[in-house]
Amino acid sequence: MGAGGHARVVLDVLRLRGYQLLGICAPELPAGSKWHGVDVLGDDTVLDDLSCDEVWLANGIGLAQRGMVRRRIQDAYFSRGYSWLTLEHPSSLRASDSWLADGVQLMAGAVVQPGCRLESGVVINTCASVDHDCQLGEHVFVGPGAVLCGAVKVDRGAFIGAGAVVLPGIHLGEDAIIGAGAVVIRSVGAGCTAVGNPARNR
């Protein structure tokens, strides 16, 4: 699903992991064309002709509209019985007792430490790290190089920008936004945006 920058990163992981690619769904591209060597099938309605027992889906949709399209598509096809691949780049590291739901994506250099729980649709981007006992709700996006220290709790849909640091035990509420490079020293409420060092609500 998708044909933007995030989709290219997902495509790279799929190829490194040896998956057989049927094609991509991307309404902005003409059906029957090629995208980075992959067949363009059309928009997501082409899945109506494919049994959920025959295919796995990979979510390459990025964060346009704060990721709402990404969430809507993933949740809709989950509810119809389709499975979303959990993708782990070969250079990512995760502890054996960490738990990943379907549809989680660990990109190159990502680290997930012991006791972590990552719910469906979470993205841990390039070289980001999630330390021990963190809990990340559905569709949380951790940007490149961000650091979550131990026992951080992040609710559904929150966004943590590139290079941000979240100190131990902090709670980020649903749909909270943490700006790039922010240092979060206190909890951030649902729907709030925090930026700066130390991070303050904007």
Tell me what each language-model feature is.
Residues M1-V38, D43-S51:
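Hydrophobic, well-ordered beta-alpha structural blocks that scaffold small-molecule cofactor pockets
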Residues A3, A26-P27, G62, H89, ...:
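Cofactor-binding loop segments of dinucleotide-utilizing enzymes, especially the Rossmann-like FAD-
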Residues R8, D12, M68, R186:
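Alpha-helical elements of the RecA-like P-loop NTPase motor core of helicases
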Residues L22, V55-W56, D102, R156:
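Conserved acidic residues
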Residues A31-H89, L93:
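Phosphate-bearing ligand-interacting subdomains
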Residues T86-R202:
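Structural signal for interior beta-strand "rungs" in well-ordered beta-sheet cores
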